[in-house]
Amino acid sequence: MTVQRFIEYTPFDSNGQQLPGESRKITLNVLLEDSGNYLIHRDILRHQLSQKQGTVSTKTRSEVRGGGKKPWRQKGTGRARAGSSRSPLWKGGGVIFGPKPKTANLKLNKKERNLALQTLLYNKRDIITQVSTLDIKNVKTKEFYNFCKEKGFNLNEKLLVIDSEKTTPLKLSTRNLKNVELISASNLNTLSLLKAKKILVTTSALNDIKEIYCG
């Protein structure tokens, strides 16, 4: 069963002052607990499967080079019979039941994906902080680190930063902070949301989220 829920945020500027005139209200379609958890789990599983390369491969006895000649005659030597030196029992032989390239995916339609994302966003509503903009001019990790400290974020915990796009200065300023994940609003996913202990979102990103996932 789906119910409508509302969340509203008042953004902060770069000096930490609230901007009441730029507050944003989002209407979310949220699933009730059991159904919501099930759909979120399915979407996370779909996302994880989509990240797999699926290129791991081993050779069977028929694919390993050589081994065409019978090592020794069938009878009379006292040794165990052998038909090929590329048997899986031999060193340098093929692999039994080894991995082969495959494509693993889980289909979930767009409506279900958006519903899972909206439900998780609502569940995480208390850890979301909105800022008017993340205008990082200098490519300095220390500058972004100090910005987060001023806002009261603990960088020993996972921080998810959502912007409308991953600008180069912002990307370079956050990449050395191991607990900070930068993502654009259009690439937002349930796995990143679930792992986050705190979420920092810009006003433009919140507008994109409203347009892309809550339309």
Curated annotation (Swiss-Prot):
Domain of life per record: Eukaryota
InterPro entries assigned to the protein according to its UniProt record, in alphabetical order: Ribosomal_uL4, Ribosomal_uL4-like, Ribosomal_uL4_dom_sf
Alphabetical keyword list: Chloroplast, Plastid, Ribonucleoprotein, Ribosomal protein, RNA-binding, rRNA-binding
Segments of this protein annotated with the region Disordered: 51-87
One CC-aspect GO term: chloroplast
Compositionally biased region (Basic residues): 67-78
Alphabetized Pfam families for the sequence: Ribosomal_L4
Listed GO MF terms: rRNA binding; structural constituent of ribosome
Keyword Magnesium: no
SUPFAM superfamilies, A to Z: Ribosomal protein L4
Gene Ontology terms describing biological process: translation
Predominant location: plastid
Subunit structure: Part of the 50S ribosomal subunit.
Alphabetical list of PANTHER family matching this protein: 50S RIBOSOMAL PROTEIN L4 (PTHR10746), LARGE RIBOSOMAL SUBUNIT PROTEIN UL4C (PTHR10746:SF17)
Function: Probably binds the 23S rRNA.
Family the UniProt entry places it in: Belongs to the universal ribosomal protein uL4 family.
Alphabetical list of NCBIfam families matching this protein: rplD_bact (TIGR03953)
Name of the protein this chain belongs to: Large ribosomal subunit protein uL4c
Organism this protein belongs to: Thalassiosira pseudonana
